UniProtKB/Swiss-Prot annotation:
It is a single-pass membrane protein. Its main location: membrane. The lineage of its organism: Bacteria, Bacillati, Bacillota, Bacilli, Lactobacillales. Residues 332-425 form the HD domain. Coiled coil: none annotated. It comes from Pediococcus pentosaceus (strain ATCC 25745 / CCUG 21536 / LMG 10740 / 183-1w). Residues 206-269 form the KH domain. It is found in: Cell membrane. Its EC number is 3.1.-.-. This is Ribonuclease Y 2. The chain crosses the membrane at residues 7-23.
């Protein structure tokens, strides 16, 4: 009985526990549903807020994008208007040039018509002269009863004189008009070339002096007992003078490339913590490489700017070296580029090869890039260099003739000579003052005039040549050689001059006798 009771109680307990568990499960499930509904509602509200925020941001971004597009369209419209104005301006300029060319063509046509009319007039005059001969012939035979041969000689003589006078008058008038026309054409051509010339007017680089930043830098530069400065001087061949009070460092040396290497070395010293002679040697080697790279880059840029065809790599290096050369303060490379552009414009106007003219203009002063310790003029060095690299005979003749030493055999040689003169003579191209120029000219002439056998002397070609006229009776052909040598040596000692000075001694003896008419 007890066992049955226990079983019944156990079953009742199990039933009660199952019921309680089911009730708890139901409550838990209900709570989970409520929590899920809250989460879903929260996410729904969050999503709704995010959608609203996104829509708001989208409107703002769309508005900003629209404003950006409107601004870009306005800028493009402004640029297009500016370009249209520029195009219209260029079209007006081209129309003006077209009008000028048309007027020039009309003037040439009128000139041709005038010459044809003049030719007809000459023919008419000749016909009248022939008729005059016939009339005079008949009149002389009738009036003077001269013989046929005598009358013929007289008539021919008078007619010949009249024809010569008419011819001379016609030739003089034509020559005067031709010279005037040529001058106008030359002025127009030069004005057109200068209008299109856009070479920068930069100053030549200063590789002669600079101010030290501080005493620490001067200490590294000078080194222990000046050993660093001496190392730089020995490796670069440049003399260095240091003013301790002004903190100025001055570089003295004829070769501007070496001065550039020395300057680059001193610039590199600034970043070195410890500087000794071994450091100087390493920096000088590095500076040499840097300057070599710059030289080649200058040459390649010049060739590329002028749109030239193949140029020998070694010749490009000589072109780049011209950047470090100056003449009266004018950078030789910039001067050569400007000369090349002017010569190219001249060539186009005259129907010549513009590319060849630009090449000749770039290379006309190439001899100035060679070391100055070589005993030769820059013209001779340039001829030798371009011949070595097989440049055109036109270019070789251009270099040889651009200072008038030899005759210019090609039109391009004359064009480069004119462009060279324009580039060097324009205002601001060269920095030598008028006072210095006049003093140098006077010094050259005074050196020659000190010699008793000298009659007079002239410094010509801006001081590039000294022409000495001697007394012919006080000298002979042998003594003038020693005179030229003495004048040359004195100029080298007493005068500071750029480039070369040519000394020319002239001895000329004229003997004139007069034959007087005998009295009858």
């Amino acid at each position: 009985m007890a066992t049955i009771l226990i079983v019944v109680l156990l079953l009742a307990s199990i039933g009660v526990g199952y019921g309680l568990r089911a009730k708890k499960h139901s409550e838990t499930l209900a709570q989970a549903r409520k929590a899920a509904e809250k989460i879903i509602e929260h996410e729904r509200q969050k999503t709704k807020a995010e959608v609203a925020e996104y829509e708001k941001n989208s409107v703002q971004e769309t508005q900003q994008y629209q404003e950006t597009i409107d601004q870009e369209l306005a800028d493009d419209l402004h640029d297009n208007q500016r370009k249209e104005a520029w195009i219209e301006q260029r079209m007006n300029l081209l129309n003006q040039k077209k009008i000028v060319l048309t007027n020039r063509a009309d003037a040439l046509a009128k000139k041709r018509q005038s010459l044809l009319q003049e030719r007809d007039n000459v023919r008419t005059t000749l016909g009248e002269a022939k008729q005059l001969i016939t009339d005079r012939w008949n009149k002389l035979q009738e009036v003077a009863d001269l013989e046929e041969q005598a009358a013929s000689k007289l008539v021919l003589k008078e007619t010949k004189q009249d024809a010569i006078r008419s011819k001379d008058e016609f030739v003089n008038n034509a020559q005067t008009e031709l010279e005037s026309s040529c001058e106008r054409e030359a002025e127009d051509l030069i004005a057109l070339a200068m209008e299109h010339s856009d070479v920068p007017r930069g100053q030549a680089e200063n590789h002669r002096s600079f101010i030290a930043e501080n005493a620490e830098y001067l200490g590294k530069l000078i080194g222990n007992s000046g050993q660093n400065v001496r190392a730089i001087e020995a490796l670069t061949g440049v003399d260095i003078v240091i003013d301790d009070q002004e903190k100025e460092v001055i570089l003295n040396g004829y070769d501007p490339v070496r001065r550039a290497v020395a300057m680059e070395t001193m610039e590199m010293i600034k970043t070195e913590k410890r500087v000794v002679p071994d450091t100087i040697e390493r920096l000088v080697n590095k500076a040499n490489k840097v300057i070599d790279q710059r030289i080649r880059q200058y040459g390649e840029d010049a060739v590329r700017e002028l749109k030239l065809k193949y140029v020998a790599p070694d010749l490009i290096k000589f072109i780049g070296r011209m950047h470090y050369r100056t003449s009266y303060g004018q950078n030789i490379l910039e001067h050569s580029i400007e000369t090349a552009k002017l010569a190219g414009i001249f060539a186009v106007e005259l129907g010549e090869d513009a590319t060849l003219a630009r090449r000749a203009g770039l290379l006309h002063d190439i001899g100035k890039s060679i070391d100055r310790d070589i005993e030769a003029t820059h013209v001779e060095l340039g001829v030798e260099l371009t011949t070595k690299y097989r440049e055109s005979p036109v270019i070789v003749n251009t270099i040889a003739s651009h200072h008038g030493d030899v005759e210019a055999r090609y039109v391009i040689a004359n064009l480069v000579e004119a462009a060279d003169a324009i580039s060097g003579a324009r205002q601001g191209a060269r920095s030598e003052s008028v006072a210095d120029y006049i003093q140098r000219i006077k010094s050259l002439e005074e050196i020659a005039n000190k010699h008793p056998e000298v009659k007079e002397s002239y410094a010509i070609q801006a001081g590039r040549e000294l022409r000495v006229i001697v007394q012919p009776k006080e000298t002979d052909d042998k003594t003038i050689h020693s005179l030229a040598t003495n004048v040359k040596n004195q100029i080298e000692e007493d005068v500071t001059y750029p480039g070369q000075v040519k000394v020319t001694v002239v001895r000329k003896l004229e003997i004139v006798e007069y034959v007087e008419k005998k009295q009858a």
